[in-house]
């Protein structure tokens, strides 16, 4: 979860610099590789390392998916689509333990990671084949470190941004406590 929490702050910026499609495909492929690494781990420390890598790459689809919606749509249509996407991502943590329990009952623990390897590789292929690049090169952000730091500092000083993110953090914390208690 630590990798996921930290990297969701950066995927928007990364995709603003390198494009939505490249960032999303790369994220899905890296998640797939991390899942395969977890499945083939021969020690607990390697499993934890691969799980951290999974967390780092897990947030790319959610964050960049929202950016793609924002690129393609505006106004009420964008709001409606973002609400649908948020709802789907909200169901994931609730359904995952149920699906995981069913898989664990019938297959080995490694099978969870093989399934995730396959699903994320398929998602990468689908993005590669069907997702248009929604951020043209002329609209991309320059990858200058000073500009990046300045943008993040500006966001950190923005009261409404910090309030909204604190509310989201508390909501996810509550969800995390619920899921941990259910496990």
Features from the language model and the residues they span:
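Short hydrophobic/alpha-helical segments at membrane-entry points of transmembrane helices
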Residues: 45-51, 163-164
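Conserved MFS/SLC helix-loop-helix module at the cytosolic interface between two early adjacent transmembrane helices
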Residues: 5-44
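Helix-loop-helix hairpin linking two adjacent transmembrane segments in secondary transporters
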Residues: 46, 83-129
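Cytoplasmic helix-loop-helix junction between adjacent transmembrane helices
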Residues: 50-89
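Residue-level signature of mid-helix packing/kink "hotspots" within the transmembrane helices
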Residues: 1-9, 93-94
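Pair of pore-lining "gating" transmembrane helices in MFS-fold secondary transporters
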Residues: 161-174
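A generic transmembrane-helix signature of 12-TM secondary carrier transporters
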Residues: 28, 32-35, 50-51, 117-124
């Amino acid at each position: 979860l630590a990798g996921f929490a930290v990297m969701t702050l950066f995927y928007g910026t990364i995709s603003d610099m390198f494009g939505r499609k490249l960032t999303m495909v790369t994220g899905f492929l890296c998640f797939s590789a991390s899942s395969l690494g977890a499945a083939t781990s021969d020690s607990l420390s390697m499993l934890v390392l691969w799980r951290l890598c999974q967390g780092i790459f897990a947030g790319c689809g959610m964050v960049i998916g929202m950016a793609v919606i924002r690129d393609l749509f505006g106004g009420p249509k964008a709001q409606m689509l973002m609400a649908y996407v948020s709802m789907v991502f909200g169901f994931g943590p609730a359904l995952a333990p149920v699906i995981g329990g069913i898989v664990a009952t019938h297959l080995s623990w490694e099978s969870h990671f093989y399934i995730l390897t396959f699903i994320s590789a398929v998602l990468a292929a689908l993005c590669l084949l069907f997702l248009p690049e929604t951020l043209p090169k002329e609209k991309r952000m320059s990858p200058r470190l000073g500009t990046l730091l300045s943008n993040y500092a500006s966001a950190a000083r923005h009261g409404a941004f910090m309030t909204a993110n604190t509310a989201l953090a508390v909501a996810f914390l509550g969800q995390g406590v619920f899921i941990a208690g259910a496990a």
